[in-house]
């Protein structure tokens, strides 16, 4: 009896030891080992069994704080209390109730009642620092160092002289009386009279010389260039009217050249001088005025 009891006890001890080893293995695999490193990172080590093989996985994690700078007005709006279905929601748009659209570039147009001479002077003043030209300002009425629109003698000297200047700026051959009653004429509508480029006897298709003077042709352009890339590079020299990147009809890939049209000739000239020979995406761009099609 004692011998049988002794064998029984040994069998129970063996089973108990085997179960303890399995529990230890399960505890080792289920509990990840987390170590805090001296450089601020954290290492997590885990183990797993797959097809009788033991695998060890080590992951290093580094926490970084990213500071985002926003305008003061945006920060103030984020503190507003939400209402309705969004009452109590955290700051920022909720994807469940708010749809975020694409960014739209909003360009303010010219005022219809603003004289052309004031428009050109304001745009020239805005473009001068970008172009880097050191030219003085001279009044067309009293020859003083100020803009014509700011002339203190405008009421006295701005009669027939201003009317004649308006007629010359429009580039027409009409009498002075017609120039007095006319308002601002956009560049694409100028010289539309008889003999002008857009009228009878002018250039075919209503195309004027101003189109070529305002449009730049960009060649040796990267195939990865987009309209946004050109607007970003050429937009700092003046207001852009349109950008066209030529693409292949079959593949849709850019063909290596594009056209950029400005609203003022001075802006186009400044962009030509600055961007001709400029590097973009490992290529040297060639910039020149667009040529007419025969």
From Swiss-Prot:
Residues 30-42 have a biased composition (Polar residues). It is found in: Cytoplasm. Belongs to the eIF-3 subunit G family. CDD domains: eIF3G (cd12933), RRM_eIF3G_like (cd12408). The keyword Cytoplasm applies. Residues 214-292 form the RRM domain. Keywords: Cytoplasm, Initiation factor, Protein biosynthesis, RNA-binding. It holds the Pfam family RRM_1. Residues 193-205 have a biased composition (Gly residues). The keyword Transmembrane helix does not apply. GO terms for cellular component: eukaryotic 43S preinitiation complex; eukaryotic 48S preinitiation complex; eukaryotic translation initiation factor 3 complex, eIF3e; eukaryotic translation initiation factor 3 complex, eIF3m; multi-eIF complex. PROSITE patterns: RRM (PS50102). This is Eukaryotic translation initiation factor 3 subunit G. Component of the eukaryotic translation initiation factor 3 (eIF-3) complex. The gene is TIF35. Its main location: cytoplasm. It comes from Yarrowia lipolytica (strain CLIB 122 / E 150) (Yeast). InterPro entries: eIF3_g, eIF3g_N, eIF3G_RRM, Nucleotide-bd_a/b_plait_sf, RBD_domain_sf, RRM_dom. Residues 1-22 have a biased composition (Basic and acidic residues). RNA-binding component of the eukaryotic translation initiation factor 3 (eIF-3) complex, which is involved in protein synthesis of a specialized repertoire of mRNAs and, together with other initiation factors, stimulates binding of mRNA and methionyl-tRNAi to the 40S ribosome. The eIF-3 complex specifically targets and initiates translation of a subset of mRNAs involved in cell proliferation. This subunit can bind 18S rRNA. GO terms for biological process: formation of cytoplasmic translation initiation complex; translation reinitiation; translational termination.
């Amino acid at each position: 009896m004692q011998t049988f009891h002794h064998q029984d006890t040994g069998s129970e001890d063996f089973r108990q030891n085997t179960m303890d080893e399995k529990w230890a293995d399960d505890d080792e695999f289920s509990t990840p080992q987390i170590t805090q490193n001296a450089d601020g990172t954290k290492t997590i080590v885990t183990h797993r069994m797959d097809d009788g093989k033991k695998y060890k996985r080590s992951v290093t994690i580094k926490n970084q704080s990213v500071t985002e700078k926003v305008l003061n007005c945006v920060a103030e709006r984020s503190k507003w209390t939400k209402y309705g279905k969004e009452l109590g929601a955290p700051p920022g748009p909720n994807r469940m109730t708010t749809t975020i659209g694409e960014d739209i570039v909003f360009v303010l147009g010219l005022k219809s009642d603003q004289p052309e001479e004031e428009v050109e002077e304001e745009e020239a003043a805005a473009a001068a620092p970008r172009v880097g030209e050191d030219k003085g300002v001279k009044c067309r009425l009293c020859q003083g160092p100020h803009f014509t629109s700011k002339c203190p003698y405008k009421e006295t000297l701005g009669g027939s002289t201003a009317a004649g200047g308006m007629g010359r700026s429009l580039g027409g051959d009409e009498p002075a009386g017609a120039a007095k009653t006319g308002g601002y004429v956009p560049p694409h509508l100028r010289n539309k009279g008889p003999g002008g480029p857009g009228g009878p006897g002018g250039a075919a298709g209503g195309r004027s010389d101003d189109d070529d003077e305002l449009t730049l042709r960009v060649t040796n352009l990267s195939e990865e260039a987009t309209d946004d890339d050109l607007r970003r590079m050429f937009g700092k020299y003046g207001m852009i009217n349109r950008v066209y990147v030529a693409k292949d009809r079959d593949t849709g890939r850019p063909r290596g050249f594009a056209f950029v049209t400005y609203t003022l000739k001075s802006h186009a000239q400044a962009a030509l001088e600055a961007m001709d020979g400029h590097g973009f995406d490992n290529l040297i761009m060639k910039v020149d005025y667009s040529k007419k099609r025969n």
